[in-house]
Amino acid sequence: MVYPRLLINLKEIEENARKVVEMASRRGIEIVGVTKVTLGDPRFAETLRKAGIGILGESRIRNVLRMKKAGIEGPFMLLRLPMMSELVEDVKHFDYIMVSDPDVAKKVDELSREMKRNVKIIYMIDVGDLREGVWFEKAVEEIAQCRGANIVGIGTNFGCYGGIIPTREKFEILLDIKEKLEKNHGFNIEIVSGGNTPALYALENGEIPEGINQLRIGEAIVLGRDITNNRVIDWLSQNTFLIEAEVIEVKEKPSVPLGKRGLDVFGRKVDFVDRGIRKRAICALGEQDIDSRGLIPVDKGVEVLHASSDHIVLDVTDFGDVKVGDVFRFRMTYSCLLKAMTSPFVEKVYEPSI
């Protein structure tokens, strides 16, 4: 057995995806399945397709090429704004491309015509999260400069940068922009892409107005979580991905470091609480593999204390007997899963049940 290893339950992932698709479809909303956290893993992509998802959302061309090589067909949506240095390849392999610049929109359209492709453009609008997109107050004026380009939709993002939560008011800003583009500038806006996993909470509570007809979902499907709204989604499974790490040391030590203190190896100042002598287990897993802040122990009585590049320190005082060679399991947040999937040192194992 090789550790650390990431256990992947495709059955639970498929069920999560199916539930999200069914809930959204009842309200006339299409789900774009986001594959980027798995680096475009073909088995994950196939699982989304089995659940009824059509468009696969990706941020990196390499991941799309990986899926295509494995026989996964489009449509694919480019979720990150394109780099000019990759634009030719993007137009060649993506069916939908998000942009936030008129010149880029025109270049996408020009390349699409040259390649005899029908690449559809989604123009991104910033309604407050402060990541990509034209500022909403200037959106109509800027997008109007793109007449002639194949702009079929507008979209926005929530939570990923500013932590902004989707509300009815935010959705209505998009719909107002759609109406002005169509009424005053002759656009036909077929798609209003109303955000990502944080928007599911609004969907559940009837806060998404009619006219928002697409969501781009990754975190909810892969983990059954919504970090922006700080919740576990109770109607979805969290038994989708688990990471296992092997114990390499068990010792009783003070709970506060001894001596003059500076910052840790990552420049962080760590606050330690004096709890006396505690039993600590070190696992062969570190920040090079995961985000230690996003590790959630499966076992009761286990607490993640801190981590360095290759070591994670656990408090196991309340767990019971622990010895070198034992294995602990953890659930993960999105940031933690992203690092685990990206790390070449984490073995990926597909399990029917975990």
From Swiss-Prot:
Purpose: Catalyzes the interconversion of D-lysine and L-lysine. Has also high activity toward ornithine, and weaker activity toward alanine. Contributes to production of D-lysine and D-alanine for use as peptidoglycan components.
GO biological process, one term: cell wall organization
Complex and partners: Homodimer.
pH-activity dependence text: Optimum pH is 9.0-10.0.
EC number(s) per entry: 5.1.1.5, 5.1.1.12
Catalytic class of the enzyme: isomerase
CDD domains: PLPDE_III_AR_like_1
GO cellular component, one term: cytosol
InterPro entries on file: Ala_racemase_N, PLP-binding_barrel
PANTHER family attached to this UniProt entry: ALANINE RACEMASE, LYSINE RACEMASE
Any GO molecular function: pyridoxal phosphate binding
Pathway: Cell wall biogenesis; peptidoglycan biosynthesis
Signal peptide bounds: none
Known cofactor(s): pyridoxal 5'-phosphate
Protein name: Lysine racemase
Superkingdom: Bacteria
Residues that bear N6-(pyridoxal phosphate)lysine: 36
Temperature dependence: Optimum temperature is 85-95 degrees Celsius.
Keywords: Cell shape, Cell wall biogenesis/degradation, Isomerase, Peptidoglycan synthesis, Pyridoxal phosphate
Family per similarity comment: Belongs to the alanine racemase family.
UniProt catalytic activity: L-lysine = D-lysine; L-ornithine = D-ornithine
